[in-house]
Amino acid sequence: REHVLPSVRMHYHVQDAGKVVNVVPDYSRIWVRVRDITKEGLQPVYEQVRKMAGGAAIMANVEHKVSLISGVHDLLPNRVGGAAMQKNLETLGDIQYTQEEIDFALELQRNNGKPELGIDGKIRPLRETLNSPGGGSTDSGDVSYNVPVVSLAATTAPKGVPWHSWSVVASSGMSIGHKGMLHAAKALGMTMVDIFKDSKLREDIKKEFDEKIGEYDYDPYLDPGPPPIDYVD
């Protein structure tokens, strides 16, 4: 991993490695996932991982097969659509929390050894598009290269709590998470109404989309046909 850019993420899980420890298995399988911020950054790393699989097979004197079971593009943002949604978020205002919800959030932060900052439900100004937007993944990237996509993030957990943790599950499953979900749903619904009613807004969104796509010829990573979901346990 030290030979890739900091934006690259690589994960793996051995799905089948034999049955007993003292017998070399006749079959084994590993699931590897590679991520990067852009498709241009992802492709060479993916190709290198494929070469590594081939090299390992040569060293072990075995046959190997690589099955691509998923592949997504990066997200193509739309500033015009984002500005329309930002207006609706500001109309809705900050997410409001009860004292009971704030106390629950503080307790979660204490249990995780994090600063007791409570819940941040403020609506922030629309930022400039970042070249490196940070962590997280979305499966709407391919959609965004075919039609304009507008998305948002809403608070569903206390500030600073590790995202892949039981604390986020606990928070998302109660009123803190429900409020964030409903806030996001309202903003999405209001923005869709604006797009349906405002022909100029639709034209401006499409114009930006066409300019960003340019001459890019969308080509999905997966081969045509049904998705190979039988490869995933």
Model-predicted regions and their roles:
Residues R1-Q109:
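Midchain, well-structured core segments that form catalytic/ion-binding scaffolds
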